[in-house]
Amino acid sequence: VISIIPV
């Protein structure tokens, strides 16, 4: 799984 979550 590839998740991109800019936090």
Curated annotation (Swiss-Prot):
Record bears the keyword Secreted: yes
GO BP annotation list: defense response to fungus; killing of cells of another organism; negative regulation of interleukin-2 production
Organism: Colletotrichum dematium (Anthracnose fungus)
Main localization (coarse): secreted
Oxidoreductase listed as a keyword: no
Name this polypeptide is given: Colutellin-A
Highest taxon of source: Eukaryota
Record-annotated membrane-spanning stretches: none
Subcellular location, record wording: Secreted
Record-level GO cellular component terms: extracellular region
Keyword terms: Antimicrobial, Fungicide, Secreted
Coiled coil: none
